Every structure is written in C-alpha cells, then in structure tokens.
C-alpha cells in the first residue's frame, strides 16, 4: 500500500495548517488516494517522524512525501531530505520517496491572478486589526524576521552557497 504525506513548514498559529489539511482531504476524494496525511517540519505538530510511523504501522510499504513549499530553499535542498534519511534508517522495509515541491506550475499563475482579483475588496493594511504578538511567543534565539544585508545576499546569488 502507498501513503502520501504533505509536509509543510509549521507555525505557532494553530489554524495555519488547515488549508493544507483541506488539500489532503480533496486529494483523497478527487483522486482516490487511500491515505493522505499532513505533517510539519517544526512548531506545532504533527511532525514528520510520528506521521511516518503512523503510515508504517498501517502497513504502507511506499511513502511519498510531497514538500508543501513553493520555493526550493534550504528546507527543500537539505533540511527535509536530511530529516527523511534519518527517519528512513528506522524503516528499511519502506520505500521513502522525496517528491517534488510545488515550485512553478502554470496553474499557479491562474491562482495568483485569482488572488489579485479577489484582493480588489480588501482593506488597506493600516485598517487591519492585528492580534497581540504575545499570543504567539517566539522561541528563545529565534527572530520574527531575519533579513540578509545586500552584500551577503549578493554572495549567495552569485554562487548559490554563500561560501
């Protein structure tokens, strides 16, 4: 049997994964996949190790992990495959597939256009009520936003590694 796992980034906001969960449900309904699970790399769970274990316990011998990311950043290039390789050691009988991320697809152009059109009735950002930041505490040592200075960014853009 085959399982599909949609693997997202994760968030401190409990509702953040609901859209991905809806996508998983629709994949099952529309295409008949017997098992489509959702998990996250970090923050609130469920996390990949426990989700993979669930699939294995249900007898899946092939698990396809689809990274639910738009861009091939560090998580796609290193973090996720590294995490998957570590977990794969526990289940030598299971074929663990690292699938394609969302990346570019012509259907995304239509989706972005839909969002642009739907934004016509949106409020000016200054009118949006914000929840208190204290509601979403930041773990020690982590920042809300980590910008890269232009010189450092130029090095990464030039050779792709920053080394």
Model-derived features: positions:
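Extended amphipathic ligand-handling, pore-lining, and cofactor/metal-binding catalytic surfaces
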Residues: 1-163
